[in-house]
Every structure is written in C-alpha cells, then in structure tokens.
Amino acid sequence: MLDIKWIRANPDKLDESLSKRGIDSVSKSIIHIDSEKRTLISLIQKLQHERKEKSNSVAHIYDKSSTDFEEIQNDVKLINQKITELETSLLHHEKRLSEIMDNLPNLVADDVPYGTNSDMNKVLKECGTIQNIKFPKHHYEIGKNLGMIDFNTATKMSGSRFVILKHDLAKLERALINFMIDVHTTEFNFFEVSPPCLVKDHAMYNVGQLPKFADASFETTTGYRLIPTAEVPLTNIFANTTLLEEKLPIRLVAFTPCFRSEVGSAGKDVKGMLRMHQFGKVELFTIATPEESNREFEYLTTAAETILKKLCLPYRVVLLCSGDIGFAAHKTYDLEVWLPAQNCYREISSCSHFSSFQARRSLSKYRELCSKKVNFLHTINGSGLAVGRTIIAILENYQNPDGSVTIPEKLRNYMGGQKLITPLTETVF
C-alpha cells in the first residue's frame, strides 16, 4: 500500500511510476476522492461539535415544555439526520478510495529499467560454465528413465501439474532442503522457522496477494488459503508489531510446500516439473529499516546465488524491467539457471525489495533508537531456492550418457556419500 500523504504531495511521480508499468494515471481520481472524503470528515466534525454545544445548552433549560427546549431538540434531530447522511457518503468515498488504493502497485525503483515485458529485462551477469552436453535430455525424460519421476500416478489422485518423486530423487529433494537451509543459517545468519501453510485472507492481503490475485491461490471452504509462498506467513509474523531499531535487521529462512492455481498458465510448461500446483521452496525473508534495506536486498540475493555457486550450476542474474516486475515489488532480481535441454535460462529464484509497501498493509513498524519516532519497516524476500527447479537443473546439467546422474559434490554428505543416481532395477510401485 502506498502512502496517501505522499500521493497528495507527489501526484506526478505516482503517475510516472504507473506509466512505467503500463498503467493509466489515477492520481487525479485519488486526490479528488480523498479531498471529498476529507471535506466530509470536516463537515461531520463541525456538526458533531454543534450538536454537543446544543445538547449542553439543553441541560440549562429547566422548563422542558418551553419553546427554546423544543427548538433545540428539533435542531439536534436535524443535525443527527445530516450527520447520518454525511457518514453514509463518507463510507462510500472511503470504499471507492480503498478499492483504488488496494489495486495500486508499488512504486518502481529509479534504477529499474523501463520495459513492457520480460524480453526487456536487463541481464546483469552470467556465472558458471555451461557444459557442452551432446543431445541433452529433458529432466522428465531423465527422471522417467531412472524410474523416479511419476506423473501418471500423481495425476490419477490429484490431476495435472502434480508429481511423485521416488527413491533417490525423493532423497535428493530432502538433501537439497537441508543443504540450502544449512548454508543460509550457518553462512548468512538467517534464523530458521517452520510456519503455517494455511492462512487467513488478511495475511494474503498484507503481502499484496489480495485482492488483485485472488484466483491465483487455492481457497478452502472454511476461510483459509493455501500459501503460494512462505513469504506470506513470514511477513505476517511482524504484522501489527512495532520493533526496536537495535533488533534489526531480522533475517528468516523457511522451507514450506507452496500451492498455486496457475491461472493463466494454460499451455505453458505442460511437460515436466517446471510449473506445478504444489512445489517445495526454501524462502528467505528480511525485515529492515529503510536505511538498511538496499544493502539487505543485495545480501539476500547473494545468499540465494551462493546455493547455485556451491552446486556449480550455470546461472545469470536479471534485473526485471518495469513491465515485468511484480505488483508489490519495488525492485526485483531474478536468478535464472541454465537448462541444457531447453537451451535457455529459466527462473529458479526471484528476490524482491518491497520498500514499505507490505509493511503499510501489515502495520509493521519500528521505533528509532535515538528519536524514538515510529516508522514503517521495509521487507525483502526471495527464493533460496525453489527445490523442484533445482532438481530439474541438477538432472539436466549433471546427466551422463549412460542415463545416470552425477550428484553435485556439495550434496554427497547429505546423500550418505552417494555419488551417482542410477536407474532403478525394480520399484515398489
């Protein structure tokens, strides 16, 4: 959520930021509705004061049958009617303003490049060595040949975009989760938590998922939503909270299953594990002061990059343009891993700086150490990494001509010293 006071003072800057996103200007509408709202509040307060004075004067009239007493009573009645009318109008204006503000995206950072789609994103750097693999197979082909990726059985019970991992690939998934969290906690001082995967609507609103993206998540019949990312519960840990500046920054890491309806993704990545309704993800989250937030954003991104470096997976860092950046994001880096079979880079992590956007919605604040002033915090989060896509990257980049897959060196201790994943000779199902 944006600051209405800032919008009043900077209408042109708001429209400029919206224009970069390809959104029509709304500052005039916001300021007009806000002005009418404030006028209504002023009129209501004036009438309430007048009513109070008249009510006080009644107390000094001892003859309740007098004309003065009756006139004042009639005046108070008319004032009450007028206040009711104005309050109804005020509620209407507040609703209109809230609808606009709730659907207003965050301001894009000054260094975010202009662009209309992902083709205009800016590649900042490429890291790692792309191996020359002759006739590379797709991850789903490799997994099928290993006998360890089962889409058919998953589809029977859950429908499309679900998968069952078996044997060494299930073990690899578990190894990756532990490896990622160990790196983030021991090398980057993130504090591990295990949050809920079901949340109420207000928690989704606080991070910017609602109301705009209501159809992107799964909703239960009892008022809960399955989280699309651990960003939701991690951010809401600090909702309606005022922290002390000396306790900041706070860095959290969590592994959770994530659930997405993938509305609008029909026909996209229909084969394999790239786009699933359920997937595991290690999430990084930081809450910091505005002065620290840019540094913490780079720090969090470095933590996510470190996983790719340790696994020796080729990747690149991309700065998203204004037309591709998320609704709540102020600035976003995507980490894209190389997939040999697709002969291209694909997103494996998205790291975003949200400035005070989420904190304003969730009322997450801090008290300055010296001045004792209370201000809104800044939030930052990113994948560290998406586990399923990391499995995809390992299968494709570490595939061998004989159908086996080499286990990255950093994961071998987590796999009981195992160096290779070889095809199953028999399976339980």
UniProtKB/Swiss-Prot annotation:
InterPro entries to which the protein is assigned, alphabetical: aa-tRNA-synt_IIb, aa-tRNA-synth_II, aa-tRNA-synth_II/BPL/LPL, Ser-tRNA-ligase_type_1, Ser-tRNA-synth_1_N, SerRS_1_N_sf, SerRS_core, tRNA-bd_arm
Broadest EC class assigned to this enzyme: ligase
Metabolic or biological pathway? Aminoacyl-tRNA biosynthesis; selenocysteinyl-tRNA(Sec) biosynthesis; L-seryl-tRNA(Sec) from L-serine and tRNA(Sec): step 1/1
Q: This protein's superkingdom?
A: Bacteria
Is rRNA-binding a UniProt keyword of this protein? no
Annotated SUPFAM superfamilies? Class II aaRS and biotin synthetases (SSF55681), tRNA-binding arm (SSF46589)
Query: Tell me, which GO biological process terms does this entry list?
Result: selenocysteine biosynthetic process; seryl-tRNA aminoacylation
Q: Where in the cell is it found?
A: Cytoplasm
**Binding site residues for L-serine:** 229-231, 283, 383
Any idea of its EC number?
A: 6.1.1.11
**Residue positions binding ATP:** 260-262, 347-350
Q: Which UniProt keywords apply?
A: Aminoacyl-tRNA synthetase, ATP-binding, Cytoplasm, Ligase, Nucleotide-binding, Protein biosynthesis
Q: Name one GO cellular component term.
A: cytoplasm
What GO molecular function terms would the record report? ATP binding; serine-tRNA ligase activity
Family, per entry: Belongs to the class-II aminoacyl-tRNA synthetase family. Type-1 seryl-tRNA synthetase subfamily.
Q: How does it assemble?
A: Homodimer. The tRNA molecule binds across the dimer.
* Recorded domain comment: Consists of two distinct domains, a catalytic core and a N-terminal extension that is involved in tRNA binding.
This chain's protein is named Serine--tRNA ligase
- What lineage does UniProt assign to this protein's organism? Bacteria, Pseudomonadati, Pseudomonadota, Alphaproteobacteria, Rickettsiales
Q: What is the primary gene name for this protein? A: serS
